[in-house]
């Protein structure tokens, strides 16, 4: 409902296209940067070097990177209701874009439908606000079993991987988002971090970009983003923007290569960057999606899939920072696009 309202609020189909192009471009560029940072940290820290651990012999199902034609075809729903029941975010987004565009084209005759959808969006925001009142209890409940089930026996041998992923996510947030916010959005990075903190914490504990979306939207609007832009950019980001996950891909791909004593070539490094960026578009923002993307990259590199079984044991711990960075990136891009649109509106304003 929020995306439909976002499209109808923009009011101009050309404006929807302009914002859409800018949004996707920002998301793809930041994702590529994140993978490069992950590769750099993996190269410097070398988390797999000297780790003498037998890989789990259990078979790990290979996930080949989908061809671009399949990615495009799969985003169009054959049954919108089925897409909503199965929480297929890509198809829901496309369906919402069509509905929003249709309402905009029809105009006044569709106002009743527009108001109904707007009401649904407001109700969902209110429900999220009520949930946030007891969120600290929920956060504690979500994190406790993760810590309890991943004790020292599991964590210590892979501690270097955990540190590398957390460090890559932190560096990406500070340097990439920090530069974007300061120089392109014209905002203090400290102010931005304080404003997005509630959503980042919720994403950290829930490991779901989609589940955190209403709260992310609220935080972005409090930071100054318009409702029309945030309602369009953020739902899109929850599906295709996975910067934290991309940083994780870079670290973990190198970890597995180092674990097996395999030296990657320059072309293989480029394969990681390209495959990881494209896979982020075709993977929904749900818990564990990053692990599916990792198997795609390992398959494209010809690395042993058994190595991913080692990562699976600590994947939940690695999922927390990457999801937090994912939604932080969504908010950063929202502020950038909003700033750009405000400048565009000022440039087109008539002079008297």
Ranges and model annotations:
Residues 9-15, 50, 106-111, 119, ...:
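Juxtamembrane helix-boundary/capping and inter-helix hinge elements in multi-pass membrane proteins
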Residues 17, 152-160, 186-197, 262-271, ...:
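Membrane-water interface of transmembrane alpha-helices in multipass transporters/channels
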Residues 23-28, 98, 162, 166, ...:
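Transmembrane helix-bundle signature of multi-pass membrane transporters/permeases
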Residues 11-14, 22-191, 351-352:
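Signature of multi-pass transmembrane helix bundles
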Residues 198-280, 334, 346-352:
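Helix-loop-helix junctions within the multi-pass membrane cores of secondary transporters/permeases
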Residues 50, 250-352:
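Transmembrane alpha-helical segments and their short flanking loops
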Residues 1-5, 39, 43, 97-101, ...:
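Transmembrane alpha-helix boundary and packing residues in multipass membrane permease domains
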